[in-house]
C-alpha cells in the first residue's frame, strides 16, 4: 500500500472504464470499506445497492440531465442510500462511506466517480432520487444520495497538482478575508 498522502493525490474521478469486470474479492473490499466507515453515534444509517447488470447500469445512466452517462460504462455501480428515519445526518454518514469506497478502489488500482443524485433531476424534471427509487424498488424511508461508478481505468489522469491548492481557503484561529489581513492571501 502506498502512503495515504500519495493515495489521495492520485485519486481522480474516472469517467472512462475498460470492459474488464471486477473480481468478487475487489467488490467485497470496496463494500467492506463502506461498512467500516464511521457514522454519527454509530447509527450506520446507510444502505447500499450493488449493480453490475449492464442493462440496469444503462438505465441508471439516464438518472439525471448531465453527469451520469459514465455509469453505462462502469463495471460496478453502488447506489448510496441514507435512512432519514434513523439519522438526521444521513447525508454526512453516507458521504463518508462513499469516499471510503472510492479510496479503497484507488488503493486497488481501480477508478471511480461520484454521481450526485440528491437534489438533481432527470431530463423530464423527475427528481433523480425518485427515478432511481422506482428502478431499484427502494423503500420510502431511504433517500438516494449518490451512485458511485467503479471499474478499471480507461484513462489515466495525472495526480492532483499541488500548486493548485487554495490555501487562502484555510483560516487559522478565526475567519478572516484577505483584505482584513492587509491584502495578503
Residues of each region from the PLM?
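Acidic, surface-exposed loops and disordered segments
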Residues: 1-185
Amino acid at each position: 500500500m502506498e502512503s495515504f498522502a500519495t493515495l489521495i493525490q492520485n485519486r481522480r474521478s474516472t469517467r472512462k472504464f475498460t470492459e474488464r469486470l471486477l473480481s468478487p474479492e475487489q467488490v467485497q473490499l470496496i463494500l467492506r470499506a463502506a461498512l467500516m466507515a464511521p457514522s454519527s453515534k454509530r447509527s450506520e444509517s446507510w444502505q447500499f445497492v450493488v449493480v453490475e447488470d449492464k442493462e440496469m447500469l444503462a438505465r441508471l445512466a439516464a438518472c439525471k440531465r448531465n453527469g451520469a452517462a459514465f455509469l453505462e460504462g462502469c463495471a460496478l455501480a453502488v447506489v448510496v442510500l441514507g435512512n432519514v428515519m434513523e439519522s438526521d445526518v444521513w447525508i454526512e454518514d453516507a458521504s463518508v462511506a462513499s469516499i471510503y469506497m472510492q479510496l479503497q478502489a484507488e488503493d486497488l488500482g481501480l477508478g471511480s466517480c461520484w454521481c450526485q443524485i440528491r437534489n438533481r433531476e432527470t431530463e423530464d424534471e423527475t427528481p433523480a432520487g425518485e427515478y432511481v427509487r422506482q428502478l431499484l424498488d427502494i423503500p420510502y424511508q431511504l433517500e438516494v444520495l449518490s451512485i458511485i461508478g467503479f471499474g478499471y481505468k480507461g484513462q489515466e489522469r495525472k495526480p492532483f497538482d499541488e500548486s493548485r491548492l487554495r490555501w487562502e481557503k484555510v483560516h487559522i484561529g478565526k475567519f478572516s478575508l484577505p483584505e482584513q489581513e492587509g491584502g495578503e492571501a
